[in-house]
Regions:
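Cytosolic nucleotide-binding catalytic cores of signal-transduction proteins
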Residues: 1-82
Length: 82
């Protein structure tokens, strides 16, 4: 997940080698698992809804390609083609 997620981001947004799961990765890992509601993500990670919204927006703005398609691309990570 981490490598495929990083491939969607510009280099400055990518976690450095050896860095543990940062907040952005945790948020988008939950989104990949199907938890897309910011309120639920905020409760799970113990952040405010505003903080989750800000992280999601910041990452989408720094993504490679169309920002409106970013979360759709995250949902495709690790998906098995049939």
């Amino acid at each position: 997940f981490v490598e495929e997620f990083n491939a969607l981001l510009t280099e400055p947004m990518q976690p450095k080698p050896g860095e543990l799961l940062n907040t952005e990765l945790r948020i988008f890992a939950l989104i990949r698992l199907g938890i897309t509601d910011s309120t639920k993500i905020a409760q799970f990670l113990r952040y405010s809804v505003t903080t989750i919204y800000n992280y999601r927006t910041r990452v989408r703005n720094k993504a490679l390609g169309e920002r409106d398609e970013f979360e759709t691309k995250v949902m495709q990570i690790g998906k098995v083609e049939e």
